[in-house]
Amino acid sequence: MDERGNRENDFLNQRTRQQGTVRRPGSSDQRPGSSGTGEYRTTGSRQTTQHDESWRGMSSQNQSASDTKDGTSWSRESAGNRQRSGVNTTGQTRSGGADTGAARTGAPRAGASRTKNTGQRRGSAGTPQGSQRPRRSRSSRARRRRRNLLIRMFLLIVVIVGAIGGIFVWKRYGPLKEKADLEQYYGLTTEDTLALVVNDQVIKGEDGDHVVGKMIDGEPYIEYSIVREFINERFYWDPNESIMLYTLPNGNVSVSVGSEEYTEVTEKKSEDFIILKTEGRTAYIALPFIQQYTNLDYSVYKNPDRVVVTSEWGTIQTAVLKRDTEVRYQGGVKSPILTEVKKADKVTILEDEDDWKKVATADGFIGYVKTNALKKATEEKTSREFTEPEYTNISLNRTINMAWHNVDNAEANSYVLQTIAGTKGLTTIAPTWFSIADTNGNITSLASSDYVNYAHQSNLDVWAVLRDFHGGINSYEETYEVLSYTSKRETLINQVIAAALQSGIDGINLDFELISGECGEHYIQFVRELSVKCRQNGLVFSVDNYVPQPYNGHYSLEEQGIMADYVVIMAYDEHTEGSYEAGSVASYGYVEQGIKDALKAVAKEKLVIGVPLYTRLWFETPKTEEEIEASEGDAANYANKVTSTAMGMDEAQQILQAAGVQAEWNDTDKQYYAEWEADGGIYKIWLEDAASLEEKLKLIKNNQLAGVAEWKLGWENSSIWDLILQYVN
């Protein structure tokens, strides 16, 4: 064999080892042991092979394919395997290494052949098959099925995720259709409980068990404390004597429990319903009866039972609905629905919150509506025909300059002329004559007709003072015991009026300083009733008050301003004997603020300002360790212990002279101030003198108030009367 032949044999042997049986061109030999092999023919330069049908149609570019079946791995090489020197190589390699040529899944059909030279497929007779579409192997179809399945699964997942996301977004941002629990909204506790809406406010009790109203025999009844707080505070209920009162300018309206009849001053009247019902000590007043004495309208609605009351009149904002919509408990689509409103319904606008407006419906729902559901808001004036009772007053045609005269015993009355001898410009003197002797309403009286005569001769009116201390009772509890009974108040008033008329005085000055918060409603009822008696008897009625503070609001300054002829603000005792720190009796700022606050409740024509004619000398020492440990409450916040002594103007000046101290002007407090060390501590004093008094008189004049009152006669320096005269006509 020549050299070329050797090389060719070596190449063929190598290929045989790699791919299986190989035949040279022109050879008719067949490899022994081959099962299912084809016939190898040679026609000229073209070699035709009858081989596995599974290879038909495979692209000449395919290099290999891997299938897995029953754990067996197969490798295939396409029919377009390399040809060198006209040799056609076709083989199968099983991972096990033996080429059997046996038919497997996709085994070749007999007579199939492939042509390598031309790239055209032919049949067994050499007919071209290029026009026939090639078949795909099962593995290719499986891959496509898997690919399609993956696509479908992906799309399904996208749809599911989208649906879940949509549900989440809807639940989070979509409008809630849930209805609010109206029984909870209105605070209804029992079947006969009546919900109450007053002036666009849902009224609930202080706790869950407090019933604000009841529907009884077809009539709405409102609980007494709710009536006082939200509708008309002039109604008064006495649980001790089971009587309800309403004070008119000339007398009381009185109603007994369970009755259709009532008395208006002296006239007997009746209704066709029971006016007052009770459960224990709790009273319920029929709303139609309340309406007789109150400027109000009301409407009753069902499901749930509720009554809508309007007692405030004036300008309001209203708007008409553009479309049907819901009123929600709060602003936002996730808030529960209170009620549904229709297109063209009118609502009252209470608050504007951009996208939502707080509104009140005519039937008593207070909630929120989308702004875009409302037409433009308009102003509307509301009113109701009603004649308010006129509580007439006595108004003196002069500026009041009243001085309190502290009278502790009958003998003190004899010094009245000496007491007023050095005064100038006084219009009124107020002796402390009347005190409550006991808890039955009896009084102690120091009234003297001689005193009155002396005062009248000096052109002074006499307004006798009635106090709830110094003379019998002297505690909050005792004052409450007297004022909380209608019969005891009546006894007290009748005795005072009788003593006043007997002595010939000109007025009553009420000075009750032991009124607790619990006693407030009884105290103001006493003021009403006493004002009626003073009005009927031509007596000037004035009432003394502390400087207005949040803790003494139960004195009802506004109601006093209606009932009384004059309201006096005692603008002193800023610091008292019981104070934990030293300070002024009446600094400028204290008096100024007191005037401002009082004017919020009382007309300036009725307001009189009390000023001090005294001061306090303070002595301040550091607390010992034992005293610090023993301190309780507010006292624990102060490191020093203080004591004080009240004294008049002249005595204060004498103290300064004895100490060799010069007081300096404090422009903040607008009074002279001094301090010095002695006796192991520090003395401090804020002087009340002509200079400080003038600053207070300027406030009174600038605010055009009714006048001034001084506490007390005998503590003043005589020079102050000329000063006061400049500010009092």
Model-derived features with residue positions:
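Glycan-recognition patch characteristic of GH18 chitinases/ENGases
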Residues: 379-495
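SH3/SH3-like beta-barrel fold
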Residues: 246, 344, 357-361, 369
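Conserved, mostly hydrophobic/aromatic
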Residues: 429, 510, 567, 609, ...
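Substrate-binding surface in catalytic domains of secreted glycosidases
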Residues: 439-446, 494, 517-654
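N-terminal targeting leaders characterized by basic, low-complexity, disordered sequences
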Residues: 1-140
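Glycan-binding loop/region signatures in secreted carbohydrate-active enzymes
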Residues: 382-384, 471-472, 615-696, 728
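Primary recognition of N-terminal secretory signal peptides and signal-anchoring hydrophobic helices
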Residues: 3-13, 145-353, 382-395
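Active-site groove signature of glycoside hydrolases
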Residues: 433, 491-522, 569-574, 578, ...
